[in-house]
Amino acid sequence: MKTLLALVIMLIGLTVVFAQNEQAPLQEKEIKYKDWTYKSVRDDKDINLRKFAKGKKLVLVVYFAPWCPNWKHEAPFAQKLYEKYKANGFDVIGVGEYDTVAAMKTNLDDKKITFSVVYESESRDSKQKTLHYDYRQTTGDTRGWGSPWNIFLEPTKLKKKGDTLTEKTFVVNGELIETDVEKFVREKLGLPAEENKAATSANKTIEICEPETKPTTFKKPELRD
């Protein structure tokens, strides 16, 4: 009986752990974020970030792994922001990580993503070799894979030359909290505040981002006379 009770308690504990969400607050952090030139997922052409940001008011760079359930939840909101504010000087660019380019293309099609997407790595084995990983260590992101990870850039404040674009900016070490981020975006674009909306996702339960994780199956012990 004690063994069965212990198993029940352990299952409850696992449920709590795996029911966490990975939303995080928008915070200004010191980070030496570097300029980059990566290949486009869609056509393999080079995209340089400094050139991409030029002439815009605000750019969201979102790093993601296509297999990550947490990215599944953020992708529609990132697309919504892009569509809603691109005419106001806002843009989004995704940086794919830890999977094949083919898998990234499929993911973009499935999620109906239309903003620009490049890739830094193509394998999960590259995890600790990426700039994405280095940036997360700098900003205190302790998650296993860090997908999604978001950084906002204000092009008028970026350095015009050199490897480093900025040394201080706003980041989100997790999923975007929709109401907070949209308020931030509107402020940076010089748009009036919208009426307060109920948080659509602040308390929702989502999956933790871990690749190929299979739940442990427990068998009920047989009772013998």
Label each PLM-derived region with a short phrase:
Residues 60-61, 92, 150:
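Hydrophobic beta-strand anchors of alpha/beta hydrolase catalytic cores
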Residues 111-113, 122-184:
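Thiol/disulfide oxidoreductase modules built on the thioredoxin-like
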Residues 83-130:
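Conserved segment of the thioredoxin-like fold in thiol-based oxidoreductases
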Residues 35-59:
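A short beta-strand-turn-helix
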